[in-house]
Amino acid sequence: MNRHISEILEKYLGRIPSLTEYHTLKSQYKNIHRVNIFNKDIFISLIKKNKKKFFSDIDTSVSEIKKLVFDYFTKQEQTYSIGKLYTIIELQTILVTTYTDILGVLTTKGPDIFSSNVQYNTSSMQKIANDALNSMNIATISDKVMGRHNVSSLVCNVNSLMEEYLRRHNKSCICYGSYSLHLLNPEIKYGDIDILQTNSRTFLIDLAFLIKFITGYNVILLKVPYLKNYMVLKDQNDSHIIDSFNIRQETMQHIPKILIDNIYIVDPTIQLLSMLKMLSQIDRLEDLAKNPDKLTIRFATLLEYVRNKYGIILNGNSNNMPMPSTIDIKKRIITVDTKYYNFAYDKCYVYLDENSLSSDILSLNADDAVDFENVSNSAFLVNDKTLYTYFSNTILLSGNDKIHEISSRGISAHILIYQALMKYDISIPLTDIVNSLIGRNKQPIYEIIPRDKKTGKHGIIDIEKDIITH
């Protein structure tokens, strides 16, 4: 045995390590040493400041916080399972090496906020948005409750923290969804704050510990198999606190964004196209049927932003939007005629099964596919004047083998997202797709082609039970 390593392990475990413990944990001795020398008093001071600033309504005393912190940092002394020890070491290491820079810094004085005047009066867009959504309000209301609707009582506290986090870490974290639109239009209400970031796992682990030490709650992190690079933080009642998509720095650099009050939000043009794409998903149409007013103000805000930015004249002249498309139901591939626009391809093959797309890209022996992760939810490849991509939502049919206009528009929006992320000019097709929303009549749904079914196991990080599964 190496005496130095053995002493580090003994100090950490509060006992002389067994031969098994020594040989399995010696590779972790540097991380264990970091935990051993970690200044818990300074850490507790940061937790207290975070509590005062973001969780002041939580009734927890300083002595209770101290006990929770010291209990966790001595937990290994009562743990003999090697697997659990590895989990404790991994989580403690993340906490001692990242917490100060990620969450501790939020309690210090931040940079001055440069107030933005990017706010929109959407009154002129309300009727257009209302009429457009009314023409798409064709789903039957479902009684099922989606997981995203079960909201934790901690959401308001975490939202307050997230607003500061987005300002301090605006190079690595941006937001989209209702909060980002609230920044454009304060009339829009929001629930939790939707974020994309480059260090999602580390951030959520640090946040989980902050909540644990302030509330005593056993919060858990879940990784969902059918959503790539997605993690959600849930409280002890299995209610949603916050979720986050992790993206590469390269993807972050591709995303068009605007700065409002020191917070970067995904460019509302991308958000409008994503909404048009999302409306092809049947459960989103069910949400529309339940609460049309909620979506109308968001839709109107996005339309007003795009109208202003691109100087769009709203006259109902949609030209070739949605782009003509046909479906092969057996192969689950849609062919879109894109030749009417100045794209680098004349047609697009839209796959409804991601594995089929991946297989065909491999068979093409092409290595220049691009993947914008959760921003587009698909890889893209241009080969021989054809764009190959994947569409992750349901496809609505309005007749036998006839794609419903809602889905056809959603697919066209998906293609425009690719064009925008590649920094190509989309002003003409964007003008057409916006005008394709005007003067439409309701078309009933004839059939629903299901979305791609993802398989796999949920990953979990449970601090209380010392579990990490991938």
From Swiss-Prot:
- Family in the record: Belongs to the poxviridae poly(A) polymerase catalytic subunit family.
Explain the purpose of this protein: Polymerase that creates the 3'-poly(A) tail of mRNA's.
Catalytic reactions of this protein: RNA(n) + ATP = RNA(n)-3'-adenine ribonucleotide + diphosphate
Q: What is this protein called?
A: Poly(A) polymerase catalytic subunit
Q: Which GO terms describe its biological process?
A: mRNA processing
Q: Which organism is it from?
A: Deerpox virus (strain Mule deer/United States/W-848-83/1983) (DPV)
Q: Which residues form the active site?
A: D192, D194
Q: Which InterPro entries match?
A: PolyA_pol_cat_Poxvir, PolyA_pol_cat_sf, PolyA_pol_nucTrfase_Poxvir, PolyA_pol_nucTrfase_sf_Poxvir, Poxvirus_polyA_pol_cat_C, Poxvirus_polyA_pol_cat_N, Poxvirus_polyA_pol_cat_N_sf
